[in-house]
UniProtKB/Swiss-Prot annotation:
Residues 392-395 are annotated as: G4. This is Translation initiation factor IF-2. Keywords: Cytoplasm, GTP-binding, Initiation factor, Nucleotide-binding, Protein biosynthesis. Pfam families: EF-G_D2, GTP_EFTU, IF-2, IF2_N. It is found in: Cytoplasm. The lineage of its organism: Bacteria, Bacillati, Bacillota, Bacilli, Bacillales. One of its GO terms (molecular function) is GTPase activity. PANTHER family: TR-TYPE G DOMAIN-CONTAINING PROTEIN, TRANSLATION INITIATION FACTOR IF-2-RELATED. CDD domains: IF2_eIF5B, IF2_mtIF2_II, mtIF2_IVc. The gene is infB. One of the essential components for the initiation of protein synthesis. Protects formylmethionyl-tRNA from spontaneous hydrolysis and promotes its binding to the 30S ribosomal subunits. Also involved in the hydrolysis of GTP during the formation of the 70S ribosomal complex.
Length: 782
């Protein structure tokens, strides 16, 4: 007998090569892999080992088969197919005997006709038991012999052998076996116990609620329907529906309110709502805002209080920034905010009223109540702040304080002397009269208001002013409203963030920490914030950076969406805007407040047919990138209290960009308004330049009617328009076709001269008609 490879032996015995290798190793025969050869002696030992294993495995299989009506079920079907396929191989060794009788023994009295799979299986078992001599076995019993598969089957020798794979009864038997195995129904899983409490935020879908309650969504939909709520699996449920379902199951419900940590207003609301230990609160200085009409003496009043010349530093004597100063009077501090009185600073005054405690309304005794005075009253009332009226300029001869009091009663500001509750303090800011009384009134009102703050918490407050300093970078003037601000604190200011590097008070001195109601100038931010933004100090720099970057990205997205947003409501406005001319403007200023003021004023310019489009605003000097943007968008650059850099000036000359520099806001507004009026379509006015009387008419073929005229008034020009007037009625209006003096063409014919005139597209000229000549002159728009 020749040697056999491991994989060939495994294939003949229908076992894996791995199993054969393991069996050889158990016998002490080492083989390398499935391609190794097995000698005859090893084959005999391996046959005995494999036969012993098969006998042990066959015994329970036979027992199982006999318990199920003595039939071998469908799982043996692949073995039968393999046997039939092997029977067609020509390499079966001669002398190998087939054992059909073994199949009959294992099946008892039942004929083998109905069990082709069993025949193959039992034949293999018999063949394995009789291989003691080491000879190769033939696993096929019948396929090489006609009719040998089952001698008891009628016509068995005449029917072709299909190997059992296409036997319908075999298939049915297999199906029956499957049905018999699945007769025991699976035990349904027990539902999980209900939770004691569920937590949700805003709303839940039916599927999400079912998951939280460990129940099927269909069960919840049914319960909702019984409760009168029709819902689908993906439908969101409101709080009431969730509570109804959970109450039916006996589960508690808790709604979780998510707080947006990037919303700085939340920190201010929490300060108002949370209960504070009274022992930690200390008295804080009052924040006083000085309001009033332009040139009524607000800055002069503050100048007198501080004994400085603040007014001299303002261009044109007009306050154009918010100034914050702190004074110490009678061992008590008062913080003053000096807001501009010009109408352009309405937004700044409104912002000042929101962060103030007391409003001082300055009214000139010689001027009375003015428009900005009324506006300041409305701001203070809207903020709910107490008002102290300072009647200024009482030193002037034409001063009339009683008239001021009378006018203010119309706005519900009744003096205490007249039975009201408004404090009136007559003063002269220029000469310092009545200032002591005014300061006493401020301290009195602050005591009544009981202004307190907690200095032990992290600081929160508002931005009074912001600017870009060339040497220090972004600089912001902050008013600490609560808590204490220290150097090194991580801070978020509006949409900017950073760490406080340095702090300078209103006197220009460096400080390490500031308490409530104290103005301070800080550096260390990554960008210039907006005036009026709120600031919050956080625990660590990482949190501040994340919140600041998130707020900046949201602001950028909101800005982009706002500029491009179109709805059905404003669609027609957008369509109309396409027909309107625009003045593109870039505004650069020294501080953010001036940028806002100038932008607001330019937007209010009401010139028919022209819009002001502010495409960019920023704080700092005019740089080269501003010129590039202006050149691309055909814009005018307005610099307010700033100058262009050398590179920017050179770029502006190369790109022919118009740069306008101003130090007083009135001049900037007037200049832009004048430029806008120049951009309007020209306005024309008709001007009659002369009249001529028709004395004779001549009809000429191919030319028409020629009117022989005498100029009675003014002159007739070649390019003028004409009207044909007959009996005082205009019968035609058109243009002159030809104008001749004798036989020569003439540009104009003066009074007292005769001429020949033909009119375009009109030949019905008659004697005694009057030809009136006129021109359209462009006039300046007002």
């Amino acid at each position: 007998m020749s040697k056999v490879r491991v994989y060939e032996y495994a294939k003949e015995h229908q076992v894996s090569s791995k199993k054969v290798i393991e069996a050889l190793k158990d016998l002490g025969i080492e083989v390398a892999n499935h391609m190794s050869t097995i000698n005859e002696n090893a084959l005999r030992q391996l046959d005995n080992a494999i036969d012993g294993t098969n006998k042990k495995a066959e015994a329970p299989k036979k027992e199982t088969t006999s318990n199920e009506n003595g039939n071998s079920k469908g799982p043996n079907k692949p073995n039968m197919t393999n046997s039939n396929e092997k029977s067609n191989k020509p390499n079966n060794p001669a002398g190998q005997a087939n054992k059909p009788a073994t199949a009959n023994k294992s099946q008892g009295a039942k004929p083998a006709t109905n069990k082709p799979a069993n025949t193959s299986k039992q034949t293999q078992s018999s063949g394995n038991q009789q291989q003691a001599g080491g000879q190769k076995r033939n696993n096929n019993n019948n396929s090489n012999r006609p009719g040998g598969g089952n001698p008891n089957r009628p016509g068995g020798n005449n029917r072709p052998n299909r190997g059992g794979n296409f036997n319908n009864k075999g298939r049915n038997t297999k199906k029956k076996g499957k049905l018999n195995h699945s007769t025991v129904p699976p035990t349904p899983p027990k539902p999980k116990e209900l939770p004691e409490k569920i937590v949700f935020s805003e709303s839940l879908t039916v599927a999400e609620l079912a998951k939280k309650l460990y129940r099927e969504p269909s069960e919840l939909i049914k319960k909702l329907f019984m409760l009168g709520v029709v819902a689908t699996i993906n439908q969101s449920l409101d709080k009431d529906a969730i509570e109804l379902i959970c109450d039916d199951y006996g589960v508690q419900v808790e709604e979780e309110i998510k707080v947006d940590v990037t919303d700085l207003d939340v920190y201010f609301e929490n300060e108002l709502n949370e209960a504070v230990d009274e022992s930690k609160l200390v008295e804080r200085p009052p924040v006083v805002t000085i309001m009033g009409h332009v040139d009524h003496g607000k800055t002069t009043l503050l100048d007198s209080l501080r004994n400085t010349k603040v007014t001299l530093g303002e261009a044109g004597g007009i306050t154009q920034h918010i100034g914050a100063y702190q004074l110490e009077i009678h061992d008590k501090k008062i913080t003053f905010l000096d807001t501009p009185g010009h109408a352009a600073f309405t937004a700044m005054r409104a912002r000042g009223a929101q962060i103030t405690d007391i409003t001082i309304l300055v009214v000139a005794a010689d001027d009375g109540v003015m428009p900005q005075t009324i506006e300041a009253i409305n701001h203070a009332k809207a903020a709910g702040m107490p008002i102290i009226v300072a009647v200024n300029k009482i030193d002037k001869p034409q001063a009339n304080p009683d008239r001021v009091m009378q006018e203010l009663t119309e706005y519900e500001l009744v003096p205490e002397a007249w039975g009201g509750d408004t404090i009136f303090a007559p003063i002269s800011a220029k000469f310092g009269e009545g200032l002591e009384n005014l300061l006493d009134m401020i301290l009195l009102v602050s005591e009544v208001e009981e202004l307190k703050a907690n200095p032990d918490r992290r600081a929160i407050g508002s931005v009074i002013e912001a600017e870009l300093d060339k040497g220090r970078g972004p600089v912001a003037t902050l008013l600490v409203q609560d808590g204490t601000l220290n150097i090194g604190d991580p801070i978020v200011v509006g949409n900017t963030f950073g760490r406080v590097r340095a702090m300078v008070n209103d006197l220009g001195r460096r400080v390490k920490k500031v308490g409530p109601s104290t103005p301070v100038e800080i550096t260390g931010l990554n960008d210039v914030p907006q005036a009026g933004d709120r600031f919050v100090v956080f625990e660590d720099e990482k949190t501040a950076r994340n919140i600041g970057e998130t707020r900046a990205s949201r602001a950028l997205v909101a800005q982009r969406s706002a500029t491009n947003r179109v709805s059905l409501d404003n669609l027609f406005e957008h369509m109309k805007a396409g027909e309107m001319k625009e003045v593109n403007v870039i505004i650069k200023a020294d501080v953010q407040g001036s940028v806002e003021a100038l932008a607001a004023s330019l937007r209010k310019i009401d010139v028919e047919g022209v819009n002001v489009k502010i495409i960019h605003t920023a704080v700092g000097a005019i740089n080269e990138s501003d010129i590039t943007l202006a050149a691309a968008s055909n814009a005018i650059v307005i610099g307010f209290n700033v100058r262009p850099t050398a590179q920017a000036r050179e770029a502006a000359e190369n790109e022919s960009v118009d740069i306008r520099l101003h130090r007083v806001i009135y001049k900037a507004i007037d200049e832009i308004e004048a430029a806008m009026k120049g951009m309007l379509d020209p306005e024309f006015q008709e001007k009659i330049i002369g009249q001529a009387q028709v004395r004779q008419t001549i009809n000429v073929s191919k030319v028409g009617t020629i009117a022989g005229c005498y100029v009675t008034d003014g002159k007739i020009t070649r390019d003028s328009g004409v009207r044909i007037i007959r009996d005082g009625i205009v019968v035609f209006e058109g243009e002159i076709a030809t104008l001749k003096r004798f036989k020569d063409d003439a540009k104009e014919v003066a009074k007292g001269y005769e001429c020949g005139i033909t009119v375009q597209n009109f030949n019905d000229i008659k004697e005694d008609d009057v030809i009136e000549a006129y021109v359209m002159e462009e006039i300046e728009r007002k």
